[in-house]
Amino acid sequence: MALSIKVQSNIKIVQSKYIKFINKFPQIIKMGLDQAGENLKTIVVDRTHKRGLDMNNRKFIGYSPYYQELKGKTKVDLQDTNRMLQSIGSKLVSSTKAQVFFRSQREAIKAFRHQTGQGKLPVRKFFGFNKKVEKLIGKNYERFINKQIKKFKIWV
């Protein structure tokens, strides 16, 4: 008396999906980093323009009475011609790093003066992020990567 068993395996399907995933993974990482850079850019611009807050979520030092009267506004949002904040961009600089920067040298100098308080300007640190923002961007990055990995359905 003998027993026989026939085993069917899905190893070929899993193997092909795994190979596809390995080839696609560097691109997924780049997409995630690009998205993280864009997230940081959006956070900096929105926090500065819409809410009038610095990188530590504190209100900016107010405009001088003369400037308030001249421009007719009291909320500090670092908007005069709207060029400085519109000049902020993001790009991938390596396979592990995204960078948020000013596309225009002129606007970068203007931002540096606001950031450091050069000349008659008070210090208004808007171009940066705190630990809370860092954690938020990290979570968004992780969520994006996990979502992309799940699309491959490696384990059938």
Functional labels for PLM-detected ranges:
Residues M1-V156:
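Short, Lys/Arg-rich flexible segments
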